[in-house]
Curated annotation (Swiss-Prot):
Pfam families: Mito_carr (PF00153). It comes from Schizosaccharomyces pombe (strain 972 / ATCC 24843). InterPro entries: Mitochondrial_sb/sol_carrier, Mt_carrier_dom_sf. This is Uncharacterized mitochondrial carrier C1442.03. GO terms for molecular function: magnesium ion transmembrane transporter activity. Keywords: Membrane, Mitochondrion, Mitochondrion inner membrane, Repeat, Transmembrane, Transmembrane helix, Transport. GO terms for biological process: magnesium ion export from mitochondrion. It is found in: Mitochondrion inner membrane. Its main location: mitochondrion. One of its GO terms (cellular component) is mitochondrial inner membrane. Solcar repeats lie at residues 13-100, 108-202, 216-328. The chain crosses the membrane at residues 13-33, 71-91, 110-130, 176-196, 218-238, 301-321. Mitochondrial solute carriers shuttle metabolites, nucleotides, and cofactors through the mitochondrial inner membrane.
Length: 338
């Protein structure tokens, strides 16, 4: 070990391995958990219907009415296209920032983990936010010409959605809810990595070795995801509402124009969604305030059950795959020093 370099940094994997393991691990976990993410999105955005109350009820309703691919796995294409490069960029940025802070600055280890998580997600957000907009809208829509749920979106395909949004709403639409997304994901990632690193250290002390095994990795990853998910649920609800709104300058109701309400009912719809006429230039602060006024504290935690289940499960799977791929590199004797 070189003098002055913390043991954690000296034994760290190569950045190229972090890039590969992060991309594969993140995308695989996101794919496996996508159906639950669809359930969470429907619950958060379906304002004026009780159709999707309850995680199990919502899951079974979508499955029975719309099927797997066009229902529970709607929006999976933009998710994968965004997830692979985004998680690869996230893990590599996180590792670089963490090592740089720990090697060059006299900062507490806890703060290094937290700040590195913030930076990693900030870099990754440039890639995943546009895909998140597409994914969220397609999840809310479900199948094309969906007779079971009216979301005010009806894209024939993933490519059709890209073309229609770009033509009718402009390219800036792909970054709708960007501020809300990074305000949700930057703290989420920071807390997730902080919790994971600290819990992993506890597990390493308990078992007396660096490799804590798959079971402990599942537990530490799950707890890290659950804790971070709980703290950021209101921001996740606001992000979903912002990305599924249809912006318009048309006059709607006096309540909406006065800023008292931010979601309008479409009386012709059999079931209503958040994709309704709204006041232009609505921000995350306005959405959170409107949610609290109209739905109370429970409105801020709408979709809490599936979100916590998703963040804990996705986090555990992601870290298991990530650590497993890193171990494969080590076992194959290809670990290199940067």
């Amino acid at each position: 070990m070189e003098p002055g370099i913390p043991p954690m940094i000296d034994k760290a994997p190569a950045y190229s391995h972090v890039l590969i393991a992060g991309g594969i691990g993140g995308a695989t976990a996101d794919f496996l958990m996508h159906s639950l993410d669809t359930v969470k999105t429907r619950q958060q955005a379906a304002l004026y219907t009780n159709k999707y109350n309850g995680m199990v009820k919502c899951y079974s309703t979508i499955l029975c009415e719309e099927g797997v691919f066009h229902g529970l796995y709607s929006g999976v294409c933009p998710m994968l296209i965004g997830s692979l490069p985004a998680t690869a960029l996230f893990f590599s940025s996180y590792e670089y920032t963490k090592r740089h802070l720990m090697s060059n600055y006299n900062l507490p280890e806890t703060l290094c983990f937290l700040l590195a998580g913030f930076v990693g997600d900030l870099f990754a957000s440039v890639v995943y936010v546009p895909s998140e907009v597409l994914k969220t809208r397609l999840q809310l829509q479900g199948r094309y010409n969906n007779p079971h749920f009216q979301s005010n979106y009806n894209y024939p395909s993933f490519r059709g959605a890209v073309k229609q949004i770009a033509k009718q709403e402009g390219m800036k639409t792909f970054f709708y809810g960007y501020r809300a997304t990074i305000l949700r994901d930057i703290p989420f990632s920071g807390f997730q990595l902080l919790f994971y690193e600290k819990l992993r250290q506890v597990a390493q002390k308990e078992c007396g070795q660096k490799d804590i095994g798959v079971f402990r990795e599942l537990i530490t990853g799950s707890l890290a995801g659950a804790g971070a998910g709980f703290l950021t649920t209101p921001l996740d609800v606001a992000k979903t509402r912002l990305q599924t709104m249809i912006r318009t300058t048309d006059k709607v109701s006096d309540d909406i124009n006065s800023g008292r309400y931010f979601f309008a009912k479409d009386e012709n719809s059999k079931s209503k969604s958040a994709a309704s006429l709204v006041k232009p230039k609505i921000g995350i602060r306005h959405v959170l305030g409107g949610l609290y006024k109209s739905e109370g504290l429970l409105g801020l935690f709408r979709g809490f059950g599936p979100r916590i289940f998703w963040t804990s499960s996705q986090s555990s799977l992601m870290f298991v795959f990530y650590e497993g791929i890193i171990r494969l590199f080590n076992k194959n004797n290809v670990l290199e020093r940067d």
